[in-house]
């Protein structure tokens, strides 16, 4: 590579070339070239506006459109030569365009700065990414609903403090995550409204002297409106931070599910098996089947948290308007996009590869007095105040624990010793099936309600 200062579009003011070290340090083309489609879309919309407003000739627009078609083909085919000397995706494309069509390429940047150009590219890129992520979330939620429907009546322990609490069904548990990822989708969709605002026209920071039509460009690019203040348009990245925060929240939900999958697959618990294609083995221990996918997703959650903190820290001390600091916004964004999209794709597939071991789940329900609350509720319905019922059942649990049995294995006389109101109908209450069936209301874990929730979930996805 040469070090000729005059090859830079901004070189006129400088008397010596940029050092090779500075070129490497300041160039972004190695990573921002992924926005080439967005850059070309933005440039074409800008060029059409310039021609419509009479700022450039119709012939110039035709040349620009012809040249951009060639550039597009070259990039798609891998023939395009990216140059570190040209710093970024914008100047690489503009330089090649100018080589192809001459002066028309030099006129493209009229009324525009790289400051509003890159802000537009990022917004286009994030809008496209949000649309992709929303499709992936929908596919993952659909897979969770399929699993919930299949296991709508499969009992398992519900936990608090990682202690057996009350019976739920595996289907009900999966639908909890369906709701969490639904809120994640809503956050992305809401963020999209603020992403879809056009910065072009802000130029470097103060607007432009040319008679531009920003609303026309916004319409061409499918934006919902324009950024109302030129300083704000080029300088802030709060929309990118908001997007990354949505990514962090989604990955937090992924991590919670991952933690449970890892625990449930442990032979000591044995609630599920994950299909072999999502697991790996050990280089030394032949028996191992490791849940690497959920473990790695759990680890990647911290990575996305880090990208969020990187962007927050990047922006916290910047004065208006644009500063070179903002070049550092792209790699955290790109990494968050890649991590979330890859994770959602694999989790949607993996959900269909989960096999539930219902026998182990039900066995676990006999080891933690899971129907103790049902016994307390039974006593309340017999006229006992809840606090008195709670205390009486606590004594019954202690007696069962000392005897080494679950509550249903206590005799009627043993139960009456702690709760005189108990009658023979109590044993129907103490079964797992009875406990589940009794919670028969919207949001409850009765199999009938889980199936109804599955039907509503499918309607929400349609």
UniProtKB/Swiss-Prot annotation:
Keyword annotations for this protein, in alphabetical order, are: Amino-acid biosynthesis, Arginine biosynthesis, Cytoplasm, Lyase
Q: Which Pfam families match?
A: ASL_C2, Lyase_1
What does the UniProt entry say about where the protein is found?
Cytoplasm
* Origin superkingdom: Bacteria
Q: Which GO terms describe its molecular function?
A: argininosuccinate lyase activity
The answer to keyword Lyase applying to this record is yes
Q: Which Gene3D superfamilies match?
A: Fumarase/aspartase (C-terminal domain), Fumarase/aspartase (Central domain), Fumarase/aspartase (N-terminal domain)
Among its keywords, does the record have Cytoplasm? yes
Q: Which CDD domains does the protein's record reference? A: Argininosuccinate_lyase (cd01359)
Q: What is its main location?
A: cytoplasm
* Recorded catalytic activity of this chain's protein: 2-(N(omega)-L-arginino)succinate = fumarate + L-arginine
GO biological process assignments: arginine biosynthetic process via ornithine; L-arginine biosynthetic process
Which pathway does the protein contribute to? Amino-acid biosynthesis; L-arginine biosynthesis; L-arginine from L-ornithine and carbamoyl phosphate: step 3/3
Q: Name one GO cellular component term.
A: cytosol
Q: What is its EC number?
A: 4.3.2.1
HAMAP family membership: Arg_succ_lyase
**Similarity comment: family membership:** Belongs to the lyase 1 family. Argininosuccinate lyase subfamily.
| Protein name, per record | Argininosuccinate lyase
Its organism's taxonomic lineage begins at: Bacteria, Pseudomonadati, Pseudomonadota, Betaproteobacteria, Rhodocyclales
Encoding gene per record: argH
């Amino acid at each position: 590579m040469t070090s000729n200062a005059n090859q830079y579009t901004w070189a006129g003011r400088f008397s010596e070339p940029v050092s090779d070290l500075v070129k490497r340090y300041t160039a972004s083309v190695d990573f921002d070239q992924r926005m080439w489609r967005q850059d070309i879309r933005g440039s074409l919309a800008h060029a059409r506006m310039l021609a419509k407003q009479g700022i450039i000739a119709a012939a110039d627009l035709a040349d620009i459109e012809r040249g951009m078609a060639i550039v597009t083909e070259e990039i798609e085919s891998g023939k395009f030569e990216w140059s570190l000397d040209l710093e970024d995706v914008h100047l690489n494309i503009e330089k090649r365009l100018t080589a192809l069509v001459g002066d028309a390429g030099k006129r493209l940047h009229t009324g525009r700065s790289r400051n509003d150009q890159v802000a537009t590219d990022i917004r286009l890129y994030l809008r496209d990414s949000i649309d992709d992520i929303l499709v992936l979330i929908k596919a993952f939620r659909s897979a969770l609903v399929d699993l919930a429907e299949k296991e709508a009546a499969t009992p398992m322990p519900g936990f608090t403090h990682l202690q057996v609490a009350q019976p739920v069904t595996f289907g009900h548990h999966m639908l909890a995550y369906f709701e969490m990822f639904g809120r994640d989708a809503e956050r992305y969709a809401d963020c999209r409204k603020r992403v879809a605002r056009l910065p072009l026209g802000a130029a470097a920071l103060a607007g432009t002297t040319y008679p531009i039509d920003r609303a026309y460009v916004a319409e061409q690019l499918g934006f919902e409106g324009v950024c109302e203040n030129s300083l704000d348009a080029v300088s802030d990245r709060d929309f990118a931070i908001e997007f990354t925060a949505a990514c962090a929240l989604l990955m937090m939900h992924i991590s919670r599910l991952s933690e449970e999958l890892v625990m449930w697959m442990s032979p000591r618990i044995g609630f599920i098996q994950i299909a072999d294609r999502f697991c790996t083995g050990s280089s030394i221990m032949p028996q191992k089947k490791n849940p690497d996918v959920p473990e790695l997703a759990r680890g990647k959650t911290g990575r996305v948290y880090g990208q969020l903190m990187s962007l927050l820290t990047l922006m916290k001390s910047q004065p208006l308007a644009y500063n070179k600091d903002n070049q550092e916004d792209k790699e955290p964004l790109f990494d968050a996009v890649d991590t979330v999209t890859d994770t959602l794709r694999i989790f949607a597939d993996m959900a269909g590869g989960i096999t539930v071991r219902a026998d182990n789940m039900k066995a676990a329900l006999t080891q933690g007095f899971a129907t103790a609350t049902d016994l307390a509720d039974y006593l309340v319905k017999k006229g006992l105040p809840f606090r008195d019922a709670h205390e009486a059942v606590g004594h019954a649990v202690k007696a069962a624990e000392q005897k080494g049995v679950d509550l249903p294995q206590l005799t009627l006389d043993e139960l009456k010793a702690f709760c005189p109101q108990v009658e023979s109908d109590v044993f129907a209450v103490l079964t797992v099936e009875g406990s589940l069936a009794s919670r028969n209301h919207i949001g409850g874990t009765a199999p009938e309600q889980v199936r109804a929730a599955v039907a509503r979930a499918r309607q929400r996805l349609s």
